[in-house]
């Protein structure tokens, strides 16, 4: 029997990249009957799925590639590939700088990986494909394979927003929506394999407008209603959203679809209208807060997390204070916050930026201290409550302790039988820790 080829994939960045990496494994397994490995030194195929959101993303990629260069000398048949958003940005330049790289492919050409590998092996020439072939990617991917009780499902690709600081429209292309019935089919197939929680993915997921077989168009709210009807699906999440397209239909879904989790990640980026204008976010803080008020009127217990950028070009202390005021007003839960990172080719990269880095670091610390304080208060308020936990596995620190997540996305560790893994369990929260909760099985 021929030995199976081993595949190692290093994933950087967002949940969309995690989804794409899973699809890479599936498409390679379908064509070459491969197996996963966590040790790149024993792999026959090494891929890095890259992210270009932060500064120096390219350098991180080439640093990683440098670690693999010597492996190529020892194993001539080793295939090394670079995928994701840095691949889209750099293209042929990756081969010029690292000639030992065999494949460069974008997020939309994952389905062509087997073909690219075969061409490389037959021609001995590096292969580059960073095109944007509409929804072809989804048409040629194999049937989804569940890994546990949770799964990601991509419902759209790309972004048309062109926020002034962001590279995503340039690296993932324009918005392309998967057909409504295709998404439902993937969710149903995952449910049959035991998946209980679905996270719908898209760069601007709440702008989903999926074509339907009857000629009509489905928005995200309608899609969520139909997914909730699939037998076995008990919890639905979605990410990442934009406030502009956070529609009344979607807000209403929180009142009519109990499967929709009571946690929302809604990036606002800043609390100053002046900064939002320079970011080209196309909404005001008042409009954002109005949507939050409507949402909480329908689902009072919902927790809301967000993304924040401090130190954007031209940000003043007054602007920053408005951001802090917004965090207090909305009472954001655990959130992501970063110092502005200049991305080449974006409009914001040309804006004058005279704020000292020490000031930016100080603002980031003040913001993170406030966000952490909010999150700890929310966690402490959960002590004594009973929570429905989706048990995902065992604790990273103790294999005898189970771990899962609450509906509002808190990690909970508790003692229980391993037969509960992949199931929902009711747990009473007994203790709040900085990064997790402890509980007792009811």
From Swiss-Prot:
One of its GO terms (molecular function) is 4 iron, 4 sulfur cluster binding. Keywords: 4Fe-4S, Cytoplasm, Iron, Iron-sulfur, Metal-binding, S-adenosyl-L-methionine, Transferase, tRNA processing. InterPro entries: Elp3/MiaA/NifB-like_rSAM (IPR006638), Methylthiotransferase (IPR005839), Methylthiotransferase_CS (IPR020612), Methylthiotransferase_N (IPR013848), Methylthiotransferase_N_sf (IPR038135), MiaB_methiolase (IPR006463), rSAM (IPR007197), rSAM_horseshoe (IPR023404). PROSITE patterns: MTTASE_N, MTTASE_RADICAL, RADICAL_SAM, TRAM. Binds 2 [4Fe-4S] clusters. One cluster is coordinated with 3 cysteines and an exchangeable S-adenosyl-L-methionine. Its EC number is 2.8.4.3. Gene3D superfamilies: Methylthiotransferase, N-terminal domain, tm_1862 like domain. It catalyses: N(6)-dimethylallyladenosine(37) in tRNA + (sulfur carrier)-SH + AH2 + 2 S-adenosyl-L-methionine = 2-methylsulfanyl-N(6)-dimethylallyladenosine(37) in tRNA + (sulfur carrier)-H + 5'-deoxyadenosine + L-methionine + A + S-adenosyl-L-homocysteine + 2 H(+). It is found in: Cytoplasm. It is an enzyme of class 2 (transferase). Its main location: cytoplasm. [4Fe-4S] cluster 2 binds at residues 159, 163, 166. Residues 5-122 form the MTTase N-terminal domain. Residues 380-442 form the TRAM domain. One of its GO terms (cellular component) is cytosol. The keyword Hydrolase does not apply. Residues 145-378 form the Radical SAM core domain. [4Fe-4S] cluster 1 binds at residues 14, 51, 85. Its cofactor is [4Fe-4S] cluster. Monomer. Catalyzes the methylthiolation of N6-(dimethylallyl)adenosine (i(6)A), leading to the formation of 2-methylthio-N6-(dimethylallyl)adenosine (ms(2)i(6)A) at position 37 in tRNAs that read codons beginning with uridine. Belongs to the methylthiotransferase family. MiaB subfamily. This is tRNA-2-methylthio-N(6)-dimethylallyladenosine synthase.
């Amino acid at each position: 029997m021929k030995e199976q080829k081993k595949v190692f994939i290093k994933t950087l960045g967002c949940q969309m990249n995690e989804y794409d990496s899973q699809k890479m494994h599936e498409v390679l397994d379908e064509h070459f009957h491969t197996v996963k490995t966590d040790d790149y030194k024993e792999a026959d195929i090494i891929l890095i799925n890259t992210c270009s959101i932060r500064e120096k993303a390219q350098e991180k990629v080439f640093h990683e590639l440098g670690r693999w260069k010597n492996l190529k000398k020892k194993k001539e048949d080793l295939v090394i590939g670079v995928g994701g958003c840095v691949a889209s940005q750099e293209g042929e330049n990756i081969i010029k700088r690292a000639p030992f790289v065999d494949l460069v492919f974008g997020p939309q050409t994952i389905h062509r990986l087997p073909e690219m590998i075969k061409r490389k092996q037959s021609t001995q020439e590096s292969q580059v494909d960073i095109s944007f072939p509409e929804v072809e990617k989804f048409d040629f991917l194999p049937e989804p394979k569940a890994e546990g009780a949770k799964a990601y499902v991509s419902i759209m690709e790309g972004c048309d927003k062109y926020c002034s600081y962001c590279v995503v429209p340039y690296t993932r292309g324009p918005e392309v929506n998967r057909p409504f019935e295709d998404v439902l089919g993937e969710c149903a197939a995952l449910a049959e394999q035991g998946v209980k929680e679905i996270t719908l993915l898209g760069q601007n997921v709440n702008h989903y407008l999926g074509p339907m077989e009857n000629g009509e168009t489905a928005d995200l709210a309608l899609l969520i209603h139909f997914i909730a009807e699939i037998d076995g699906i008990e919890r639905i999440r979605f990410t990442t959203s934009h406030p502009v397209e956070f529609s009344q239909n979607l807000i209403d879904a929180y009142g009519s679809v109990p499967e929709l989790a009571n946690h929302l990640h809604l990036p606002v980026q800043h609390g100053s209208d002046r900064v939002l204008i320079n970011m080209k976010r196309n909404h005001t803080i008042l409009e954002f807060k109005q949507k939050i008020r409507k949402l909480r009127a329908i689902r009072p217990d919902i927790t809301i997390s967000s993304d924040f950028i401090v130190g954007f070009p031209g940000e003043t202390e007054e602007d920053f204070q408005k951001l802090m005021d917004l965090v207090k007003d909305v009472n954001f839960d655990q959130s992501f916050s970063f110092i502005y990172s200049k991305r080449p080719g974006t409009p914001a990269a040309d804006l004058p930026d005279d704020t000292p880095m020490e000031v930016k670091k100080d603002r980031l610390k003040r913001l993170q201290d406030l966000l952490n304080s909010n999150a700890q208060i929310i966690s402490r308020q959960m002590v004594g409550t009973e929570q429905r936990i989706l048990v995902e596995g065992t604790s990273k620190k103790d294999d005898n302790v189970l771990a899962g997540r609450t509906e509002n996305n808190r990690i909970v560790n508790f003692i229980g039988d391993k037969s509960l893994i992949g199931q929902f369990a009711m747990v009473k929260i007994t203790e709040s820790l900085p990064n997790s909760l402890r509980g007792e099985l009811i």
